Amino acid sequence: MKQLKITKFPALDYAGNEAFNTLSTNLSFAGASVKKIMVTSCHAAEGKSYLSMNLMRTLAQRGIKVALVDADLRRSMVNSDYGLKYEDGRNDGKGLSHFLAGMVGMDEVIYQTDIPNAIMVPVGRDVPNPLALLTNSHFAELLDMLARMADYVIVDAPPVGVVIDAAEIAKACDGTLIAVNYNDVSRQELLDVKQQIEQTGCPILGTVLNQVDYDNYMGRKYYK
């Protein structure tokens, strides 16, 4: 298996560690049939990739085998934000888009990361109109293969409220986590996203709040 190094991965603080440990534990309550998990959001820049990457790391550190698929084929930021380095030292390499386009085989896009227990399928290159690639049978076949290799498959998808790609991705997944910026998304927007995902037959596992002032939030909760 090819090797992939993640060179920019800041450590979580205490509150962050506790939050991701809790989320990892809660995933186990979803049942053994829930293995392929899509992570999405209502808008761009709500932290879905942050959620995906840190959930991958937390699960792996707990000895759970996990695969991450970067499926944001339009404008992924994982390569640059997390400093992915491929075997030859390059900043880019073969990934999901290359496999779905039939340019390489499945084994060419599955990488062992430098985090034990964590494998990854990077995005490859941006695609202007990826819907045709996501609707072919190769995408579901890749997720099924990864589900045999790992305990969980985390799929970092585009925002539901921006493009239709995530709804197509959801059809191949067992459940969805929605990243939500605290006080930045309206109730109606969240309900619309919930409806779009549920129409695909993929259940909502829950929402994860980002950008929360933890001390202030817990203080208000305690004194109410």
PLM regions with names:
Residues 2-17, 21, 25-28, 32, ...:
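P-loop/Walker-type NTP enzyme "switch/lid" segment
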Residues 64, 151, 202:
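Short phosphate-binding/catalytic loops that engage adenosine nucleotides
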Residues 1-33, 188-224:
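C-terminal lobe/tail of nucleotide-utilizing enzymes
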Residues 145-151, 160-183:
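Inter-motif core of Ras-like GTPase G domains
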Residues 50-51, 55:
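Hydrophobic positions on the alpha1 helix immediately C-terminal to the Walker A/P-loop
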Residues 38-40, 69, 122-123, 155-156, ...:
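Conserved beta-strand segments of the P-loop GTPase G domain that flank and frequently precede/overlap
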Residues 73-75, 159, 213:
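Short, glycine/acidic-enriched loop or turn micro-motifs at the edges of active sites
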